[in-house]
Amino acid sequence: MQEKAKQIVANWYNDEAGKDEISAVTEEDVYVVWFCKTLQNWKALLSTDLPDGMYFEVTYNGDKKEAYLDAYRKIKNVKISD
């Protein structure tokens, strides 16, 4: 399941991302930040060490045997003190 999520993200980079900006991305370039499986469904949050700031959410619907990819770009990271 996690390998499938990595493959989906790597394929997105290689098919959709700007080919001038990023060289070929493999599953080894993608890491899982968080993963959860409930019954036949699962969700994974993934990223890479690439400087583009992309973050991904892959959701798998086991009833429909379909995966969905959401791609996000980090806009800002600010410190908030207590």
What is each of the regions a protein language model found here?
Residues 1-28:
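Short, non-transmembrane alpha-helical segments in secretory-pathway proteins
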Residues 11-14, 41, 61, 77:
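Detector for Asparagine
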Residues 28-31, 76-78:
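Residue-level marker of intrinsically disordered, low-complexity segments enriched
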